[in-house]
Regions:
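Hydrophobic alpha-helical membrane-insertion segments
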Residues: 10-25, 93-114
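Short, membrane-exposed interhelical loops at transmembrane-helix boundaries
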Residues: 43-44, 121-139
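N-terminal membrane topogenic signal
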Residues: 1-10
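Hydrophobic alpha-helical transmembrane segments
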Residues: 50-67, 132-155
Length: 177
């Protein structure tokens, strides 16, 4: 059963990440359609007959599930320190939620951070015909901060696993004495 839970968690991480990516890219599409229509869509070969929001969501899913794989591997592997299978399942799920929460929080912070109005350097990496370079850069910033938040969330998740393991171990010692 423990092996089944371990494998299920490894599968769950990229699935949850896909949902996160879909929602994340729907929100960033609202900020800058140009980021997708003039930049991201060129990197993916989705049918042009699809609605732009559907294509944006699919891009978010494709990018996020790939990020969910290493996060899931690390958090699930560290979760194996818990001897109890139920704790492995629930504590690892908590770390997944923590990771997605941190990624979301950092993305939200980035959405409200000022973008420099002198955007000449950033313009070099943009397509030429961008009408709203500030919104475009805001989406770039949100994406970058989301990844940083995910990494910080994963590190906090590792710490949470260790903290819960020590807490449970101390409780077991107290019970036995």
């Amino acid at each position: 059963m423990r092996t089944f839970i371990f494998i299920a968690l490894l599968i769950l991480a990229p699935v949850l990440a896909s949902f996160y990516g879909f929602i994340h890219d729907q929100m960033t599409f609202s900020i800058s359609e140009e980021f997708f229509t003039k930049f991201r869509f060129n990197n993916y070969e989705f049918p042009h007959s699809w609605h732009p929001r559907v294509r944006a969501g699919m891009i978010g899913m494709l990018n996020a599930w790939q990020t969910g794989i290493p996060f899931g591997i690390v958090l699930t592997a560290v979760g194996r320190i818990h001897r109890n299978t139920r704790k492995l399942l629930f504590y690892t799920f908590y770390t997944f939620v923590l990771t997605f929460t941190m990624a979301s929080l950092f993305s939200i912070i980035a959405a409200y951070m000022p973008i420099p109005t002198d955007i000449a350097i950033a313009r070099q990496s943009m397509p030429e015909d961008i009408l709203d370079p500030i919104a475009f850069q805001r989406v770039v910033q949100i994406n970058n901060f989301g990844y940083v938040g995910g990494i910080i969330g994963m590190l906090l998740g590792i710490g949470l696993h260790v903290l819960l393991y020590r807490r449970d171990k101390n409780k077991a010692i107290e019970k036995s004495t």
